[in-house]
């Protein structure tokens, strides 16, 4: 091969790498009813905005938002046409069969988001258009409109077997969408799986962020591959959570921030909110775009 051709190929390769890097950094989820899902008033903010206390009122944020409180949101908050991009699937893996609902591009996705339910939940919870104020409908639309993939799976338990099933699901879709970052949102007890996945080096290398919604803490995260990779973490928590006390989660958030200078972690406290409030109120687009913007 001539020297000139070698130089041309090297220059072209450099251009492709640079162009790909720009695209990865520039990915931003499309808008989806942003005004309706924006946080109410921020009551206080600290740590450079990493910690916020947000106003939450049941009469406004449940009764004023739902046509049937906690069962059916007002139609303004949802766009059900996204169901055309929704599939109920079963994946055969070495860890077993993983039933899951997929919304969006199952190959060549720009980003991948999973929701892992809590105790008593199932794969259908994460794709229910009408409950939790329409917030699951919003994430479905956000991913479908942005060329991404949203997954809501079943799993056997919140321990090693469940983590293996979810890791296998992530691996399958990540291999079909090279370069797509993977974001795992864990509701309540589902957080046990978030922290287990953080310990798996192969999975951690694929993670673009963890979202803990009314969930638990785990000090072992500070020694995990995900922590070493500075995987962004978001905490959404109700101040009146009786399952996982907010003070313990706030203390864990501060421990993360103090253990690694500038660690990308955010905390939104919903004042007067309860255990399920973060699933209803967390702003998917704001949080995921912040995570996507991290180096």
Predicted regions and their residues:
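Short alpha-helix in the alpha/beta-hydrolase fold that links the catalytic acid
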Residues: 245-256
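Short beta-strand/loop motif that positions the catalytic acidic residue
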Residues: 229, 234-237, 241
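Short amphipathic alpha-helix adjacent to the substrate-entry channel of hydrolases
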Residues: 127-150
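Short beta-strand element of the alpha/beta-hydrolase
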Residues: 109-120
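N-terminal cap/lid segment of alpha/beta-hydrolase-fold proteins
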Residues: 46, 51-107
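C-terminal catalytic histidine-bearing segment of alpha/beta-hydrolase fold enzymes
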Residues: 262-295
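Alpha/beta-hydrolase active-site loop
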Residues: 156-177
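Primarily recognizes the serine-hydrolase "nucleophile elbow" in alpha/beta-hydrolase
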Residues: 176, 181-229
């Amino acid at each position: 091969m001539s020297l000139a051709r070698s130089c041309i190929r090297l220059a072209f390769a450099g251009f492709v790498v640079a162009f790909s890097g720009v695209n990865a950094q520039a990915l931003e989820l499309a808008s989806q009813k942003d005004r309706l899902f924006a946080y109410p008033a921020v009551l206080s903010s600290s740590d450079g905005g990493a910690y916020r206390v947000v106003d939450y009122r049941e009469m406004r944020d449940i009764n004023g938002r739902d046509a049937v409180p906690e069962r059916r949101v007002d139609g303004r908050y949802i766009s059900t046409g996204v169901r055309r991009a929704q599939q109920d699937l079963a994946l055969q893996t070495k860890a077993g069969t993983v039933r899951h609902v997929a919304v969006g591009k199952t190959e060549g996705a720009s980003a991948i988001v999973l929701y892992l339910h809590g105790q008593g939940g199932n794969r259908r919870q994460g794709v229910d258009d009408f409950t939790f104020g329409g917030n699951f409908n919003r994430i479905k639309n956000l991913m479908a409109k942005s060329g991404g993939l949203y997954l809501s799976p079943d799993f056997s338990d919140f321990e090693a077997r469940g983590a293996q099933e979810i890791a296998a699901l992530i691996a399958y879709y990540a291999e079909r969408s090279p370069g797509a970052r993977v974001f795992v949102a864990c509701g309540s007890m589902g957080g046990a799986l978030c922290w287990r996945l953080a310990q798996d080096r192969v999975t951690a290398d694929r993670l673009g962020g963890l979202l803990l919604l009314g969930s638990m803490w785990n000090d072992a995260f500070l020694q995990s591959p995900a922590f070493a990779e500075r995987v962004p973490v978001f905490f959404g928590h109700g101040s009146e959570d009786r399952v996982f006390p907010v003070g313990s989660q706030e203390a864990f958030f501060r421990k993360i921030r103090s253990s690694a200078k500038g660690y990308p972690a955010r905390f939104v406290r919903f004042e007067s909110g309860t255990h399920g409030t973060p699933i209803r109120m967390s702003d998917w687009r704001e949080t995921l775009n912040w995570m996507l913007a991290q180096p």
